């Protein structure tokens, strides 16, 4: 009979620093211990959940003595919800940790030769800063310890909110989210209340059954609101009644869409978004430029910080008005158009066709005539022949997804030999890997992080490069 593993409890652990992925760090007999939701200065008892040769992971079993820096979390869902994990950490300490994260990835781990990293650009708003949130309907919500699951009806087990970390089939029923301004919370709570009252079924991710699947709320600084409601199957009568009820309750919704998504995953990128009522898009403005945002469009989710991010990008590009600029991973062409007035010509490339259509419309609406946009996989479009046909870039701006750039793309960039590059990244680790390749022919001249997501460990980083 196998012997049951005995729990490892570490007492009076002193938390020393903030570590990678938002965890905190302590040292125990030469080994590193990573602890969720801890703050430097905390003294805690920790239950170890993973033990390897050089490190351990665990969670706080008992708070012996809280750090003088520790703050009371402002959200009632803290600790279960997977977002905003740094609520107990003062914002200044969050910024310091993100600055350190960039240094660690580029210098300590990446061994790149970089100048002094500029101070991180903080966010003026640390709550209600997102312009987009997605909520999931589930028949299996997270049941708390003080609840009797057996006594709950099937409807009482329904939830509408966010997936719980490590439990793909569990959803936290969110009462109030501090990430997106109203009417986001009001819309979500109304839809849940209506659905329960009318007996509409929520999605079961294990059995792949149920009516309501997920919902996306997008908002703008101008007060536009877009709602995309996703159903697992069609039921014209029930769907129409729900959409009409939403439209009547929230006249401020300017774009009301629905999707019938019967496939295995809940992504809508390959699904038809059907406009039920209102305008086909919402709009954001930046320095007099108007940007169309459709249901599938990518747009930086922190609008005010996006302006700061793009301003740093433009500053690092050092444009004089005569340059040909390539904007790779252009999205809806925001950066491309943001720098177009300081460039001779801008070429934007993006994988999502709908985003490129929006980019073209945006350029036309803004009276911009020096931007050309192309849709397709970057490694397939950006070839040596493409560069020869469209002209050698003087400046390349890159803003790739978390995975970074494909090796083939890096080769073409090096062959194109632009005078300068600006690399914008949401993942300093993959950025450091790519920079090692690019630094065969380039030197890093400036680095500046930007905080787009307060209360999380995520950080954007902007790097300027100059040809050797």
Regions found by a protein language model. Give the residues of each.
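Rossmann-like S-adenosyl-L-methionine
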Residues: 2-21, 234-468
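Terminal RNA-binding accessory module
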Residues: 1-77, 372, 380
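Internal alpha/beta scaffold segment
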Residues: 169-205, 209-211, 233-257
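Short, conserved phosphate/pyrophosphate- and ester-handling motifs at nucleotide-, phospho-/glycolipid
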Residues: 41, 180, 302
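Carbohydrate-binding surface patches
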Residues: 216-219, 225-235
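Extended interfacial segments that mediate partner engagement and assembly in macromolecular machines
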Residues: 61-72, 79-201
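Short, acidic/hydrophobic/Gly-rich beta-strand patch recurrent on exposed beta strands
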Residues: 24-29, 159-164, 359
